[in-house]
Design a protein with these regions (language model features):
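AAA+ P-loop NTPase catalytic core and its hallmark functional loops
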Residues: 1-192
Length: 192
């Protein structure tokens, strides 16, 4: 683990404790919720971890328009009319793709998504599978984890998260970095 953290340290400025906790939670097969204000490097940290671990990364932007169908996927309507319902005409959404591939599903701003969409995620976190009408059961492949991020509740457009979510995740607070780390981030962005 020490070697992995050293490699991650070359991709992510600071955040040593957060990297250690995220890697430990993933190693323990746990889902993760990162809580903190915008611009604190939550997405950057997770992309680096997925890349170093060789795990797929499915990104979902959480907003009021994220329906269960957009998250799960759907049958191609034109092909349903000609061929009927068949597994080969189902178009995977990011959740289904992550389940099948054993990837990380990263839901940004989870506290902005509708309750019915959140309920789909709660079921998948608990059961480690998804049941899709006319398609059947999709079990989570080894490596699948939900990693979500959220801004503080008082941010505009956010909602409180159900305790059912909190019961199923490791929570990690992420705050702004020290001034010298922020300067290093800017220097890296300008140089690279």
């Amino acid at each position: 683990m020490r070697e992995l953290l050293q490699r991650l340290g070359s991709d992510v400025v600071g955040r040593h404790r957060e990297l250690e906790l995220v890697v430990a939670a993933l190693g323990a097969d746990r889902h993760i919720l990162l809580e903190g204000p915008p611009g604190t490097g939550k997405s950057t940290l997770l992309r680096a971890v997925a890349r170093e671990l060789g795990i797929g990364f499915e990104f979902v932007e959480g907003n009021a328009e994220l329906t269960p169908a957009r998250l799960v996927g759907h049958f191609d309507p034109a092909r349903v009319l000609t061929d009927g319902y068949s597994p080969d005409i189902f178009e995977d959404g990011p959740l289904t793709a992550a389940l099948r591939e054993g990837s990380l599903l990263y839901v940004e701003e989870i506290n902005r998504i509708p309750e019915e969409t959140l309920n789909v995620l709660i079921t998948v976190m608990s059961e480690r599978e998804l049941n899709v009408p006319r398609l059947g059961r999709i079990p989570a492949a080894h490596g699948f984890r939900l990693v979500a991020a959220m801004n503080p509740f008082d941010a505009i457009g956010t909602a409180r998260i159900s305790s059912a979510v909190y019961d199923r995740v490791c929570r990690l607070a992420v705050d702004y970095q020290a001034p010298e780390e922020e300067e290093a981030i800017v220097a890296r962005a300008v140089d690279g």
